[in-house]
Amino acid sequence: MRQLAAGSLLSLLKVLLLPLAPAPAQDANSASTPGSPLSPTEYERFFALLTPTWKAETTCRLRATHGCRNPTLVQLDQYENHGLVPDGAVCSDLPYASWFESFCQFTQYRCSNHVYYAKRVRCSQPVSILSPNSLKEVDTSSEVPITTMTSPVSSHITATGRQVFQPWPERLNNNVEELLQSSLSLGGQEQGQEHKQEHKQEQGQEHKQDEGQEQEEQEEEQEEEGKQEEGQGTEESLEAMSGLQADSEPKFQSEFVSSNPFSFTPRVREVESTPMMMENIQELIRSAQEMDEMGDVYEEENIWRAQSPGSLLQLPHVDALLVLCYSIVENTCVITPTAKAWQYLEDETLGFGKSVCDSLGRRHLAACSLCDFCSLKLEQCHSETNLQRQQCDNSHKTPFISPLLASQSMSIGTQIGTLKSGRFYGLDLYGGLRMDFWCARLATKGCEDNRVASWLQTEFLSFQDGDFPTKICDTEYVQYPNYCAFKSQQCMMRNRDRKVSRMRCLQNETYTVLTQAKSEDLVLRWSQEFSTLTLGQAG
């Protein structure tokens, strides 16, 4: 069983889950509330499908490597909660661990401590008492509508897509096998190409629920913008854009700078600012056009239409272009709603897709969710030549991240560690947080957690040296198939007061090459060791 490949895991889990499908129908006549724990009888049926223990261990292996957001595991968790995964604290029948901050944490605890058949039970106290207030303050705001459950139908807009630990969207419509094949790969982040589908589903469903409220908000914002922009020049337009950005992220910027930088990016998605920002940018463009004399407008439009596709000047008006550039240059590009909206605008109107390349043959690297796009836009905004975005193909061979983006990243708390004799221990800081925090998050949330994946990818790209720059070797001459396995080993050794660094892979050296199965074991072992450590400290 320990040598099961990802494809075998998938096939096995599909077999395990197939008998679960009739379960909701069987309980349709029961009085159970969606999101409530299973009854003892229902748990007997549920656990029977995960017996013997190797079946439960198989699901735990997948959970350790992919986290709770894997679509197959989402389906499993939904069945364990009458079709809806709860958001917030849950309680268990374990006498020494009676409650957990989330259902995901509960399932990971079961796996790490081999108590595969522990049950979720109803809490004797209200969830609000059990849930720490600090978590709510950090990851929610008064302007973010909070949904408390997630369902198979509306999983893109629900609470499990917005839990504190994993804010990125559900992948229920993805090909599960494709996700498994990229489980520990740094290239496995698919969130860019899913944005259109996610936006359409969210727009269709959320607007039905909050249509009246959103219309009022949009009318108020448009009215405010009309007052701000009427009869004003480019300078006032820049100020309007700054005010507009402040409206879109009321408390986030200050919280971001003072507390936890990379938690801001998921919250931009939660605010659902993209559609509104799109309308605001388009309104700003229209207002900027009206500010000039009609003849000048026509000249500008003719110039714009003459531009080739992908040119930064393809935006309808130079003033609007200045506004957009000003917004991303004067702020930290990767955390601005402007950049998110601008990216969406290009995806929708120009159809470039998630890869970002330019007319100089460069392929901008996606070290974070907006890093590649911001790298290009910062270059375009500062360029004196007509730098264009292009569809990526084999001619774009030069990997590139703009130094302008790197200089901005220092303001969001990322610091590169020192390089000594071809060795690299890791980032001193990422998102303002030290390695111990990220090791703990890796152990509890898994490699596929959005923030963990961004940390891994940024660190991986920070050290490219040796005969094989993209391969991963360490100072104990072990070669890893993916960076998550290496970091799990490094975190585990750090916990044991042993230092293991990444080292350049050389052609004339011999390395112990880990298989994919053994790399998954490393991730699981670190998760188990961390769980044991925290349990010991708590007890």
Swiss-Prot record:
One of its GO terms (biological process) is sperm capacitation. It is found in: Secreted; Cytoplasmic vesicle, Secretory vesicle, Acrosome. Pfam families: PBP_sp32. One of its GO terms (cellular component) is acrosomal membrane. It comes from the Eukaryota. Its main location: secreted. The keyword Zinc-finger does not apply. Specifically expressed in testis. Keywords: Cytoplasmic vesicle, Phosphoprotein, Secreted, Signal. InterPro entries: Proacrosin-bd (IPR009865). Residues 1-25 form the signal peptide. Residues 212-238 have a biased composition (Acidic residues). Residues 26-269 form a propeptide. Coiled coil: none annotated. The N-terminus is blocked. Residues 26-106, 315-423 are annotated as: Pro-ACR binding. Residues 186-259 are annotated as: Disordered. Residues 192-211 have a biased composition (Basic and acidic residues). This is Acrosin-binding protein.
